[in-house]
């Protein structure tokens, strides 16, 4: 269980509209803290679940498979164990193979097509761990061979929201971290 200092709303006290999100998150990760904490701000939780996930991540113009690849690459790079627990099944459900999941940390050498490699390279630029992230001319050429500028904006927005939500989840202590997670708060003074 996470050790967030924020108030949590148990499932029995959640509005009905959030039950599916709680059930899904708890079923995949065993840790529904995100839903329980953000239920205290229902408009924000609705934004995340309905506007971001339903309309943009699972909707939008770009094939969800590319968004799933980017999301998994970011969660692996950021070291979010809770995220990885839900993103691996999401990737598999979107048609990403186990071989691709296993190779996602070395995507240029992995079993990815050129469009997938371009998206993963873009994710590496958006990652919170990359302070020099940039859409170089070379990366833009790789992406634009497969995606319109509107698609690139959609992919970038999806990645930015996912990265930002991961960082917020780390700060609020809503998620478990992998042993290699680079986001570790300083030791509290004695």
Regions found by a protein language model. Name each.
Residues 44-49, 79-83, 129-137:
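Short acidic alpha-helix initiation/capping motifs at coil-to-helix transition points
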Residues 46-60, 99-106, 137-145:
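Short amphipathic alpha-helical segments and their helix-coil junctions
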Residues 1-66, 92, 187-190:
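Mobile cap/lid helix-loop segments that border enzyme active or cofactor-binding sites
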Residues 171-190:
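Acidic, carboxylate-rich catalytic segments that either coordinate divalent cations
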């Amino acid at each position: 269980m996470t050790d967030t200092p924020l108030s949590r709303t148990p499932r029995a006290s959640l509005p009905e509209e959030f039950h599916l999100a709680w059930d899904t998150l708890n079923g995949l990760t065993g840790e529904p803290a995100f839903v329980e904490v953000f239920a205290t701000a229902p408009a924000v939780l609705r934004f995340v679940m309905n506007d971001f996930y339903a309309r943009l991540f699972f909707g939008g113009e770009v094939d969800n498979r590319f968004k799933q690849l980017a999301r998994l690459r970011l969660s692996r790079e950021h070291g979010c164990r809770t995220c990885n627990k839900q993103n691996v099944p999401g990737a598999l459900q979107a048609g990403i193979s186990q071989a691709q999941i296993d190779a996602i940390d070395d995507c240029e050498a992995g079993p990815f097509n050129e469009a997938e490699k371009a998206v993963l390279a873009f994710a590496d630029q958006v990652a919170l761990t990359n302070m020099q992230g940039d859409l170089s001319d070379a990366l833009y050429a790789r992406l634009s061979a497969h995606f319109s500028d509107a698609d690139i904006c959609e992919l970038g927005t999806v990645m930015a929201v996912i990265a930002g939500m991961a960082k917020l989840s780390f700060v609020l202590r809503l998620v478990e971290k992998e042993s290699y997670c680079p986001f570790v708060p300083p030791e509290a003074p004695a």
